[in-house]
Amino acid sequence: MEVKASLKYARVGAQKARLVADLVRGKDVNEAVKTLTFLNKKTAGMVKKLIESAVANAEYKKVMDVDSLYVKAIWVDQGPVLKRFRPRAQGRAFGVRKKTSHINVVLEEK
């Protein structure tokens, strides 16, 4: 049986989030949380909370042993881009693209 959790509209680029997702894919849940705790990246905290949310979903359903869960799948999709303008010299303005992403995780028992 699988449990899922997702984080929508995370204010981080998909390419940067995929670097963190690749580190925990296939790992035991406890090992993944330890890895993310000491990883010095903005996305690591988001993915850690997402995995903990999926574990809480498994506890709530009461159909799985939480200690035997592992990260079966984790993927990052690109979300909508927030377009902003940054004022520049002599009345000009440059466009700034603030990227978002959707992070999904699936946990399963070993």
Curated annotation (Swiss-Prot):
Transmembrane segments: none annotated. It comes from the Bacteria. GO terms for biological process: translation. The gene is rplV. It comes from Bdellovibrio bacteriovorus (strain ATCC 15356 / DSM 50701 / NCIMB 9529 / HD100). InterPro entries: Ribosomal_uL22, Ribosomal_uL22_bac/chlpt-type, Ribosomal_uL22_bac/org-type, Ribosomal_uL22_CS, Ribosomal_uL22_sf. This is Large ribosomal subunit protein uL22. The keyword RNA-binding applies. GO terms for cellular component: cytosolic large ribosomal subunit. This protein binds specifically to 23S rRNA; its binding is stimulated by other ribosomal proteins, e.g. L4, L17, and L20. It is important during the early stages of 50S assembly. It makes multiple contacts with different domains of the 23S rRNA in the assembled 50S subunit and ribosome.
